[in-house]
Amino acid sequence: MMKSFVLIFVSVLFFSCKNEVEKKEVVKEQEAQFVSNQNTDSLYTFAYLPTSTTKQIVKHKYYTLSYYEKFEQAEWVAYELKAAYLKNNDFKRPYFIEDPKVTTGSADWRNYKKSGYDKGHLCPAGDMEFDKEAYNDTFYTSNISPQKHDFNSGIWNRVEQKTRYWAEKYNDIYVVTGGILKDSDKKIGTEKVSVPKYFYKIILAKSGKEHKAIAFLVPNEDSDKSIYDFVVSIETLEKMTGIDFFPNLKNLKSSKDF
């Protein structure tokens, strides 16, 4: 009789504890769901990431990239740019270093030495001056591409400045940028880093319940033309790169009216 009582007591205790654990797990799941829902206003979510043709997506705290080992650079870099991020902190400029998160190894900065090309940021350091860690993270070699100096400091700089203007206008934008790699014949350095003939940049913003975008395709050379002369459709860039830039946003169109 005593043995039966003990067995019943142990069984009740077991199921009681199990139910308590299950309740806690449900609460945690609900809390996690709540946090997830609270973050849906941010454009910087995986829902906005382009597809990767290389399957090597590298996530840093403030930007994400898809690394293309064959060309020794990212095929795209994507990041959120908020109006609140636009600061002018005088951070000390760090040295470029290899990206420890790139499993195949990102190119050494010495490939650019005496090449005649700038180490052109894809996610600009100037967009990340709100935080020292964010700023320093832009100096990984996975975030650079060979750019002609007149291009880097000229027309491309004007596109970057306009991007910051749009961040202020819309308060929060999403940027995807990179080089057109598949037709890049010229290489630099011992690791044969490809030199893109063109660079692209897509800016996405939310206007009410709708999304709107503008896309640029700019030759890797200086130009005195208006940046609007280089506006193209997102479909044009997708055909050139094989990348689906916003797979979760159906019927997204880009235009000069941004």
Region annotations inferred by a language model:
Residues 17-258:
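Domain-level detector for secreted/extracellular nuclease and nuclease-toxin modules, and
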Residues 1-2:
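N-terminal secretory signal peptides that target proteins for export/translocation
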Residues 5-14:
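Sec-dependent N-terminal signal peptides
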